Amino acid sequence: MEFKKRIRIISVKEFRIKFSTEENCLDYLAKLRWPNGFVCPKCQNQESYRQAERGFYRCKACDNKVSVIAGTVFHSTNLRLTDWFWAIYRMAQDKKGFSAMQLMKEIDVAYPTAWSVLHKIRCAMEERDKQYHIKGRIELDDAYLGGKSKGKRGRGAEGKVPILVAVEKRQTRNGTKPGYVAIRIVKSLSSVEVKDFVDSKIVPWSIIETDALSVYGILDDLDFVHESFVTENGIKAKELFPWVHLVIGNLKRFILGTHHHADPKYLRLYVSEYCYRLNRRFHEDDLFEHLLKACLLISPRKHNILGFRKNSL
């Protein structure tokens, strides 16, 4: 298989040809994991023998046996890599979201297996996005997701999960446009949660625009420039903060449209999926490869917090 040029997925047909066998998938994973050739994690030697066993290499210097999928999202998997690659491809290509029910039908596996595969991929998305921060002029707002109650709407709505959403507001010749996005599910809408969110996701001395809700007052005491706006006298919040409201609206439609039966326990992973894809909307041609790399980088321990049974995949 040729690796001199980055693969750009154009069609399902092309994908099926390039990754039609386990061997093709293993070769591609090895190229991504060791772009300059095999490196033994034990002695740093670069010479190895390819083993007949699935994805294993043996170091010529110290005889260390290394698996290309060890320590990744594919660690100890019993599922074919061709099916894993297909799931990652579908997650990368489908802007509206991809459900476990769809994957179950497409690769002919049990629903729990399809569900686990997609959630492990979402864990990789979540871990990857934790490394990045947003900066510049930021719109910051809160919202509520989910809930079956038809009672109170808006802030404090019953049975709903609070979130904080921050969106870069980039200047253009004709006005502004949204940049990168950060979203977090919080236990409650409080000053403590606001502080923790902005400290971990926004570069210091960025300009943060909010409404006049009291919990945002904490920003005045932090290393940011805080601009607070009172949304009254006919001025609507959507007019003052158009981009963050657009992101919130699209997030709600994403969850209701594809994951409307989502367990609140895993809601953060659906939010992570939405945020990951949104932040890479300008690099859609490369999204499959980026997501595959994210799956190689995540530790197996990270996705075990979801309660997956060992060797269930």
List PLM regions with ranges.
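Residue-level recognition of single "structural anchor" positions
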Residues: M1-L313
